[in-house]
Curated annotation (Swiss-Prot):
GO biological process, one term: amino acid biosynthetic process
Purpose of the protein: Catalyzes the transfer of the enolpyruvyl moiety of phosphoenolpyruvate (PEP) to the 5-hydroxyl of shikimate-3-phosphate (S3P) to produce enolpyruvyl shikimate-3-phosphate and inorganic phosphate.
InterPro entries registered for this protein in UniProt: Enolpyruvate_Tfrase_dom, Enolpyruvate_Tfrase_sf, EPSP_synthase, EPSP_synthase_CS, RNA3'P_cycl/enolpyr_Trfase_a/b
Protein name per its UniProtKB record: 3-phosphoshikimate 1-carboxyvinyltransferase
Subcellular location: Cytoplasm
Keywords attached to this entry: Amino-acid biosynthesis, Aromatic amino acid biosynthesis, Cytoplasm, Transferase
Binding site for 3-phosphoshikimate: K22, S23, R27, S170, S171, Q172, S198, D314, N337, K341
Assembly and binders: Monomer.
UniProt GO cellular component terms: cytoplasm
Annotated gene: aroA
Molecular function, one GO term: 3-phosphoshikimate 1-carboxyvinyltransferase activity
Primary location class: cytoplasm
Organism placement in taxonomy: Bacteria, Pseudomonadati, Pseudomonadota, Gammaproteobacteria, Alteromonadales
Catalytic residue positions: D314
Reactions catalysed according to its record: 3-phosphoshikimate + phosphoenolpyruvate = 5-O-(1-carboxyvinyl)-3-phosphoshikimate + phosphate
């Protein structure tokens, strides 16, 4: 197994341009596919999850042209639903942002589509989405365990009507349903059961749908109306914002060991909820400066916080490791959906924080972290989870440094993360 040793870092300073958002990249690729016209996507993320989406679209007959560095994609829309005369089998790795939306989109047309994946994705639920699609007439068959991929879709289109979907596990299910609803045969009324998690991710979806010419009536996130007869039309160009979750590591670095760190590609105009991570750092004592498309973090003595972080689930992971450098006990609440991500992130985070000496209480949907008097060095397991690797790079700011196992797992969203991280040191 490959390991990366991060030696102690005294101070960080510099500027990082953040790669494109995974959430926006895969949503925009799918909407561009369903749209009429050609769409040019710029600052597209070049990572495993996006490659799985692109490979699947190509297999489904979608024509696109990628720039040499894979960050500009010119895609010819189908002007409607995806259909195939021959049976198709698509491999989607561990990419939830490809598996869930494609599962929904492939029910719209005609054909037989089988979606396969890595073993971890087979443990990540999709049942709430499939239940909703079945209410609209979809024929979806599970190939192994009920409620989980792999699965086969025998597509004949979706009817309109009323549909219920659970909102308390993952916002990706609702996102997938929203994106396909305009192409159903009739108007769709979506009723959300339970408290909707990760609402800002739904805002990303609605903003992109609007950019492609579709109107959704949002009744306070409890009900969504999508009137029949709409279609997606390419806006011509789509700029993919920098990934706000990826920005969190550099902002935390500035807060812990600044110096001053500036991230560009996200700012106050961002449509991503994870930019609010900077507000949490500010509550902890960091100095934060906002621009339209940049954020600056300057270091200070950090103090613990006790907050509901359901609105920033991915970026909240960075608070867990930043908490090791804060005075007092930090509590991150309402994060049950950490458990159904690339790994069970609550269990993984608790295990690895204890390795470096932290006192940790792992609840069903919260984590409580008290830093040790002296942080221990350790070998950090990353569970094939990109965010575990990037979060624990913060331990380079301890006097003993840290070793990261399987650092290349960052290829899921940020292949050259550790190179960029090293560029801030000095």
């Amino acid at each position: 197994m490959k390991q990366l040793r991060l030696e102690p870092v005294v101070q960080v300073r510099g500027e990082i341009n953040i790669p494109g958002s995974k959430s926006i990249s895969n949503r925009a690729l799918l909407l561009a596919t369903l749209a009429q016209g050609t769409t040019t996507l710029t600052n597209l993320l070049d990572s495993d999850d996006i490659r799985h989406m692109l490979a699947s679209l190509k297999q489904l007959g979608v024509n696109y042209r990628l720039s040499q560095n894979n960050t500009v994609c010119e895609l010819d829309g189908l002007g409607g639903v995806i259909s195939s005369e021959s049976a198709q089998e698509l491999f989607l790795g561990n990419a939830g942002t490809a598996m869930r939306p494609l599962c929904a989109a492939l029910t719209l047309g005609q054909g037989e589509f089988t979606l396969t994946c890595e073993p971890r994705m087979e443990e990540r639920p999709i049942g709430d989405l499939v239940d909703a699609l079945r209410q609209l007439g979809a024929n979806v068959v599970y190939l192994k365990n009920d409620g989980f991929p792999p699965l086969t879709i025998n597509a004949t289109g979706l009817s309109g009507g009323d549909v219920e979907i659970a909102g308390d596990l993952s916002s990706q299910f609702l996102t997938a349903l929203l994106m396909v609803a305009p192409l159903a045969k009739g108007s769709v009324n979506i009723h959300v059961k339970g408290e909707l998690v990760s609402k800002p991710y739904i805002d990303i979806t609605l903003a992109l749908m609007a950019q492609f010419g579709v109107t959704v009536i949002n009744h306070d996130y409890a009900r969504f109306e999508i009137v029949a007869g709409q279609r997606y039309v390419s806006p011509g160009k789509v700029l993919v914002e920098g990934d706000a979750s990826s920005a969190s590591y550099f902002l935390a670095a500035g807060a812990i060991k600044g110096g001053e760190v500036k991230v560009t590609g996200v700012g106050r105009l961002s449509i991503q909820g994870d930019v609010k991570f900077a507000d949490v750092l500010e509550k902890m004592g960091a100095e934060i400066e906002w621009g339209d498309d940049y954020i600056i973090a300057r270091g200070s003595q950090l103090t613990a916080v006790d907050l509901d972080m359901n609105h920033i689930p991915d970026a909240a992971m960075t608070i867990a490791t930043a908490a090791l450098f804060a005075k007092g006990t930090t509590v991150i609440r309402n994060i049950y959906n950490w458990r159904i991500k690339e790994t069970d992130r609550l269990a993984a985070m608790a295990t690895e924080l204890r390795k470096v000496g932290a006192e940790v209480e792992e609840g069903n949907d919260y984590i409580k972290i008290t830093p040790p008097a002296v942080i221990n060095t350790a070998e950090i397991d990353t569970y094939n989870d990109h965010r575990m690797a990037m979060c624990f790079s913060m331990l380079a700011f301890a006097d003993c440094g840290i070793t990261i196992n399987d650092p290349d797992c960052t290829s899921k969203t940020f292949p050259d993360y550790f190179k960029q991280f090293a560029s801030l040191q000095g």
